[in-house]
Amino acid sequence: MAPNAATKKRAAARDDDFVLTLSDDENDIFENGVEEDGDNAQEDTLSSSKKRKREAAEAPKGKNKKQKQLKKSKKGESAAGAVSDDQSSEEDEAEAMDAGEDDGALDSEFEFDVGGNANTGVIEGFDGWEARNGASLADAPKNGDKKAVDIDDIISRRKAKKEAELKKKQQKEKKRREEEGEEESEGEDADSDGGMSVDFQDDELLAADGFGMGADGADESDDDVENGSNDSDDSEGKGSEDEESGDEYNDDDAASDNDSVATPVHHPDDEAASDEESEAESEVDAEEAEKRKAFFAPEEKSTAVSTFNRSFQDFNLSRPILRGLASVNFTTPTPIQQKTIPVALLGKDIVGSAVTGSGKTAAFVVPILERLLFRPRKVPTSRVAILMPTRELAVQCYNVATKLATHTDITFCQLVGGFSLREQENILKKRPDVIIATPGRFIDHMRNSPSFTVDTLEILVLDEADRMLEDGFADELNEILTTIPKSRQTMLFSATMTDSVDKLIRVGLNRPVRLMVDSKKNTSMNLTQEFVRLRPGREDKRLGYLLYLCNEIYTGRVIVFFRQKREAHRVRIVFGLLGLKAAELHGSMSQEQRIKSVENFREGKVAFLLATDLASRGLDIKGVETVINYEAPQSHEIYLHRVGRTARAGRSGRACTIAAEPDRKIVKSAVKAGKAQGAKIVSRVVDPAVADEWAAKAKGLEDEIEEVLQEEKLEKQMAQAEMQVTKGENLIKHEAEIMSRPKRTWFETERDKRAARKLGATELNGPSKKDKVKLSNKDKKRLDDARQRHEGNIGWKKGKADREAPKQGKNKGGKTKSDKKNKIKMKGKK
């Protein structure tokens, strides 16, 4: 009887204090409309403790977790201690059954997840321009940016203003006509219709099949039909595409441009240049070869074949690294990754080269993360520095590295211009493991941030190393290399890596391993290269050709490269006035504007990205279909980097270059390299009449372009004035704090910085025209005398040496002084 009394006590306590949770089959109860009486409810409560184990075993895991949470919360409300003890013991048993502790059997549906990707979402379309949380970089807060001037706002305001003026003018005209009277106006209209004042010179009023129409261009149209130029709307490169005539730069198609133009013969410079190139390629200096043999470590040929097509798991990487690779959907390593990762894990210096879009960033980030997993954690220390030539490339590398290190405790910091110095200093105080920076901002913090030390750096990476070794970055790179420890691992990567030992030896490499996946500087095999030739005398129509291509052929996901910032900005205004959605990217923009332009292009808000060579290196934007070169670049290496923005990671793409006579050398080298590689080379012929029509449209916008530029200039001046006012207010408000800060120092003078910038511009755009220097009066007089002598106005003026020389003229007797001297000598001998 004792057990029955205890059971009744428990039931009474449960009825008073314990609130029942809803069962798993509550929906069935409500659907059937069955309500339980009090007695039935008591019976269910009495038997609930016996059924709980069975319900917990049959219910799904998700529901069990919710029930446990509810039971735990209700358990605290119970007043009877005995009841709570029984419930807790029963819940522990249910949890043990849920955890699989009742027996040692393994679930038949269990799958071992190597990459650890079961609970983390795979990033299907991995893009290096997304923030770590998936948000857009343009939405991230930025400090220190200047107030931006939006060209689209200026153009839209001008359009709205013109529409308002036109509407106002129409209303005035309508009001004037109403005042004059409708009958009189109708009579005037009837008279004007009755007179034969139609201008038959207007082509729009004449039928296309009328007498004499099309006679002038009949031959040209026939040629165009034969060449297939009417199929220019096809994105697969229709028009006139001739793969066989690529190396001769389509000289046989002169008749398609103008029948009166004779087919030109081979240019003599082509043959001379080709001879020089062949000699330079065939004759490798023996001394340079000996230098390379002594400088580079011997290559291991046996490992190259065995490591082909292996997976990331074969590298014996740690599980957090494999999970990070799986989260961004990296499964099979690329050739450069297969070669680099094992060597980098050994701590050796590396000089690596591969085609654009082959995964060079992951090739050096993965071994760095693997080595950092085994670092001492007692004292936080900065151990890795990755240097990039541009801000965009540094931001992109930072995003890729942070995503790969999602499942680790490795910390990162990006030091690039355009972001707040104070925020970067606060991050550097925490001593992040990896620092991704541009050289200028890295040196700034190295000299002026007391919390930043480089004495503990163990790994140095130079991405786009050939650009970093050029004259524009030489001084900054030397400053960094002489400051950081010499006992470090150094890795250099680029698509166009140099082999010059004299340049590489400056970096302080120690017997580096040379990993050249593509040593011939080739393009992607999925890239189709097109060339549009401008005949001599048509260089001023270049913008017309570009507008035709962007309106008719390539209408979306296009990057257009320019040599100069001024030209890119001007074309950006032309595109806006013609209704083409475009963004620009160059060095004169603020960091906020630059990131916003890339984000708008990446998200498809704009169809065209007008950029300088700032975006030619390393920029990885998913889905770029076409690259257009407004003019050929300075060198073949820059051309490879430009066209490498498309056809990345196995995708297809097109590159179109608008080339004139001065661009012949670059086009010839590109065609030669493409044919040697087996790439698709195509010549596209554009109807000159169509190009002239677009060029005329652009020329008609000259006045409006100047007005937009003037309005933009005024807005910039206003923004500058506002900034100066704010600066003055801050100086007054925070005078003590500002004056107490130490002055920031730099290792170069302003003159040296200007010289370095000039050298960098020369590397990209070639030597500029000779700078104008004010001549002194002495130089002016010398030039005037030379011009007068050349014109024959005055004779040659004797110099001092001519005036002091003895005269050789004849005397009165007809004999010279030398004759007299010889006669005296002869008399002495007699």
Swiss-Prot record:
Residues 62-74 have a biased composition (Basic residues). Residues 689-735 form a coiled coil. Residues 341-515 form the Helicase ATP-binding domain. The Q motif is unique to and characteristic of the DEAD box family of RNA helicases and controls ATP binding and hydrolysis. This is ATP-dependent RNA helicase drs1. It comes from Aspergillus fumigatus (strain ATCC MYA-4609 / CBS 101355 / FGSC A1100 / Af293). It is found in: Nucleus, Nucleolus. One of its GO terms (molecular function) is ATP binding. The gene is drs1.
